[in-house]
Amino acid sequence: MKYIGAHVSAAGGLANAAIRAVEIDATAFALFTKNQRQWRAAPLTTQTIDEFKAACEKYHYTSAQILPHDSYLINLGHPVTEALEKSRDAFIDEMQRCEQLGLSLLNFHPGSHLMQISEEDCLARIAESINIALDKTQGVTAVIENTAGQGSNLGFKFEHLAAIIDGVEDKFRVGVCIDTCHAFAAGYDLRTPAECEKTFADFARIVGFKYLRGMHLNDAKSTFGSRVDRHHSLGEGNIGHDAFRWIMQDDRFDGIPLILETINPDIWAEEIAWLKAQQTEKAVA
């Protein structure tokens, strides 16, 4: 079964994220559990936790259908010790918030070397950051998102994801989220079913589908291999509709949150309905 949704706003209270997901007929959703552009946030109150859990139960969202995202400020591979520790502390807090909310996944961008350390050193720092966070939490899986490779961001190669996983001690609590726009911008073609087959055969060989814990379904304003992260509405960008239809018809993508981060929230309900309709092999438009 496909879980399909979008990254919805939690403005006004975390419980509102579930309500907004229902409003677009989503069977999955993503959210920030705190302001994603601030380092610190007030601790979750018992009321906030209870209201969120009640809303999820009311609208039938289990933790398998929810993919929280951490702060954009966090860099788990930071080359400077003091800044690395700050990021690690913030990541642990994000993981603990998920644990309190009964959520089993936390999606995050792996990190950047900032042109100051080697890729290998940065990837090792990211893996160690995950180990530290897993040691201080229970029941939450760290879900590494592939990147477009802008600037000095790592995670744009499947080999980067595999290297991080290799350095994580608890393999049961680490996974990956594949963003289609990021993959395309990083040089993984998705424009035809044949290219999708090739790209995900590479993914299966290098990383492994057992680690796939979520996806971000985004078309791309950016061009193929450009290393530029620019999302677009489904079918409106340089990837086109075929990739998303292909994903909907492949059962390897069942049972994980498939999340839209496309640029026009006003048509998320339409995009979700279209994705749901593609699950039959007869779907061609």
Swiss-Prot record:
Binding site for Zn(2+) 1: H69, H109, E145
GO biological process: base-excision repair
Requisite cofactors: Zn(2+)
Sites where the protein binds Zn(2+) 3: H182, D229, H231
The reaction(s) this protein catalyses: Endonucleolytic cleavage to 5'-phosphooligonucleotide end-products
Pfam families reported in the protein's UniProt record: AP_endonuc_2
Residues the record lists as binding Zn(2+) 2: E145, D179, H216, E261
EC number: 3.1.21.2
Molecular function, one GO term: zinc ion binding
Stored CDD domains: AP2Ec
CC cofactor note: Binds 3 Zn(2+) ions.
Record's keyword terms, sorted: DNA damage, DNA repair, Endonuclease, Hydrolase, Metal-binding, Nuclease, Zinc
Known role: Endonuclease IV plays a role in DNA repair. It cleaves phosphodiester bonds at apurinic or apyrimidinic (AP) sites, generating a 3'-hydroxyl group and a 5'-terminal sugar phosphate.
NCBIfam families attached to this UniProt entry: nfo (TIGR00587), PRK01060.1-4 (NF002199)
Family: Belongs to the AP endonuclease 2 family.
Protein name: Probable endonuclease 4
Organism this protein belongs to: Shigella sonnei (strain Ss046)
Lineage: Bacteria, Pseudomonadati, Pseudomonadota, Gammaproteobacteria, Enterobacterales
This protein's encoding gene: nfo
